[in-house]
Amino acid sequence: MKYLAVVIATLLMTHSHAEDKSKWTGKNKPLANATYLVYSGEPGDRGPPTTTDRKLAIAIRGQAAKEIFDSIGPDAKEVSCSLEDGERMRSKGEVWCSYMPSDGYMCFLGFNLRTGKPHSGGTC
């Protein structure tokens, strides 16, 4: 669980590692454009959480997703989730992000809440 807290705190402060024209303050930014789900099963086959299987999926959009996307490059080659021209995908470990001209930036991450280990937070 300690690992989970460290990873979430790091993601909330991703702006500290991004090149930003504004002065870095070391303060967390609000994460207003994010959603989460506690579930059981796998990202592509989710069900209600159980006493033995509880996972957390987090989806982040907007500027925070762009900062994460920019931090985990380069683009994945020959990987696509849609037929949209201009789609870009990036991933590191269990964190993956996409950019679609029609929808902007979106990043996914997740954790197994029973073990604290990273887990994919989304699927195509």
Annotate each predicted stretch with a short phrase.
Residues 98-124:
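Short, exposed beta-strand-loop hairpins at the edges of beta-sheets
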Residues 30-93:
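Mature extracytoplasmic domains of secretory-pathway proteins
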Residues 17-26:
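Cleaved targeting-peptide boundary
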Residues 9-17:
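Hydrophobic h-region of N-terminal signal peptides that target proteins for export
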Residues 1-5:
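Positively charged n-region of N-terminal signal peptides that target proteins for export
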